[in-house]
């Protein structure tokens, strides 16, 4: 009988990555609740440039994810992760050395160019056995939620008492701690560097990493975050119309996120996740479709909106854990893993960017019901495509 318990090394790697992701995401998320207010006080600050300062991080992430993945396949994942964290550290220092909105934009752009998400997931999948990857990614997923909740609560307090730039000093310190954790606590993968790397490998590599099976995951994570962004730019408005004051929204988000993670852990650790693994993508897409239908039919009813949001979060979190863990199992050639996981991360950021831009465009000409109808149509296309692209 196979041992599905995590061994000491797997637990150490998982917890180390948890801390690294927690510290890094605290530095990223902490800016969001305060930038719109304090950015106006910077030299040259205006709403457009503040929006650019927010978006430039995601733009450089999109640009550098794949190059970092290719470099990790060639030179090693651990070295590239440390290099990316150092770039994030440099970006933080650039921000605190200026009092200009343009310095903030440049610093945020450099922070984003340390694009290590895909490389980190590739190294994690190198070091964790297949049967334990879902558990490991689930635990790390919690660190994302925790970092978001801590950031939303603490960032305004820190900025009010210690100043706007204190957030970036904290980000710089967290980057150094993260580098030390990666260097001392996370081992290198034995197979992560291709010893006989040749130039003629690229043609085979491109054909391999863009095959139908992988494309299903690339498209899946793109649409998942596309729908998430589309929803969260209109759901707060729907909650306000239902009578829920803005300063109470966090309670609904907190409750639904916590319950969705509880549901996820129940599946992963007690039901072993495998009893409906074969059709998991289609099942979750169906529940996303159901949640969007409930949003459309809610008529600003608070209970209906909350229930729809809960269904959406459950399906979202299951796919958010399933996609990277199962994708890593599909990669039969280890030295392509960094490139594939980086394309996956790029698809994720592209989904967020496209969701935000298209939502802004649609909101200019249509109401929220039309947007929900558009999302339902996209979800149906996704379901059909996923069904026919099954392995």
From Swiss-Prot:
Spans traversing the lipid bilayer: 15-35, 48-68, 81-101, 139-159, 167-187, 217-237, 251-271, 275-295, 303-323, 346-366, 369-389
Subcellular compartments: Cell membrane
One Gene Ontology term of the molecular function aspect: transmembrane transporter activity
Source species, domain of life: Bacteria
Pfam family, one: MFS_1
GO cellular component: plasma membrane
Membrane topology: Multi-pass membrane protein
Keyword Transport belongs to the record: yes
Keywords (A to Z) from UniProt: Cell membrane, Membrane, Transmembrane, Transmembrane helix, Transport
Protein family according to the UniProt entry: Belongs to the major facilitator superfamily.
Name of the protein: Uncharacterized transporter BUsg_450
Species of the source: Buchnera aphidicola subsp. Schizaphis graminum (strain Sg)
